[in-house]
């Protein structure tokens, strides 16, 4: 029997702090401090090595080490690990290796195969093959702006046929896809686009994975709670105050502005790995 994760609440897709030297080594001490701070703000869980975590610029060994540090600092809160790749058997082996190295990992956030632009049938096959190999539940990550391919509504429902595929992080900006997931009821819907957070939560998303919640974390947690308590007017008022935060966070390619803001607060250096560049002064 496959255990089902509880995805309710505000999840943080973590930045990966780096030392401000040419090597840009991962700053594990800063990461641990940041995770402990964010956990105390009431977040439901974390995502390590997602797009906000600059996973594409980290080696496999670095990613595994980031996961270890995050788990150790999370205080028992669940941690999802970002996962991507084109060859399903290799991605499945990576999931197995990560779970063996870090048994406390709660699950994996898996993108559609990037760059190759497979058919929808190919996407289903890819996810099901990885799910069959994975020892942990999967969250399908629909982010066509990065992968170059949509996970269509019918495809999402086909993914739900596998018991290890339990949720979708929706960055598609397609209300029809979200509505299909909600009507079907087998996948938990997680809001993925920060600028659509209020709308997605109000329409029934059980939780959110929100990068801009590195900033004003407690307020973002409060927003989710207000909507869970059906206090829509209070949520709308709070959202009006949070919208400038989300707009600023994505004024440049993610996560450079978030890192700059956290650096100003003393949590980490604003270092990113090329081809990313530090935030401009105007941001």
For the regions a language model picked out, list residue spans one by one:
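Catalytic alpha/beta core domains of metabolic enzymes, predominantly
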Residues: 129-136, 144-250
């Amino acid at each position: 029997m496959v255990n089902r994760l509880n995805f309710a609440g505000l999840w943080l897709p973590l930045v990966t702090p780096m030392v401000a030297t040419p090597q840009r080594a991962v700053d594990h001490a800063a990461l641990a401090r940041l995770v402990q701070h964010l956990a105390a703000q009431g977040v439901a869980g974390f995502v390590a090595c997602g797009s906000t975590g600059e996973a594409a610029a980290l080696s496999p060994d670095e990613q595994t080490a980031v996961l270890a540090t995050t788990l150790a600092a999370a205080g028992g809160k669940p941690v999802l690990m970002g996962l991507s790749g084109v060859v399903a058997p290799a991605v499945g082996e990576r999931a197995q290796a990560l779970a063996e190295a870090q048994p406390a990992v709660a699950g994996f956030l898996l993108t559609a195969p990037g760059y190759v632009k497979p058919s929808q049938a190919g996407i289903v096959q890819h996810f099901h093959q990885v799910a069959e190999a994975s020892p942990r539940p999967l969250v399908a990550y629909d982010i066509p702006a990065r992968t170059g391919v949509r996970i269509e509504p019918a495809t999402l429902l086909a993914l739900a046929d596998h018991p290890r595929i339990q949720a979708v992080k929706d960055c598609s900006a397609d209300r029809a896809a979200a509505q299909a997931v909600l009507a079907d009821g087998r996948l938990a819907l997680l809001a993925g686009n920060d600028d659509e957070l209020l709308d997605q939560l109000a329409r029934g998303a059980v939780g959110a994975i929100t990068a801009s919640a590195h900033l004003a974390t407690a307020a973002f947690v409060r927003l989710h709670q207000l909507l869970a308590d059906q206090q829509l007017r209070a949520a709308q008022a709070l959202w009006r105050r949070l919208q400038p935060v989300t707009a600023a966070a994505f004024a440049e390619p993610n996560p450079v502005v978030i890192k700059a803001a956290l650096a100003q607060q003393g949590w980490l250096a604003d270092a990113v790995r090329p081809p990313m560049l530090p935030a401009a002064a105007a941001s």
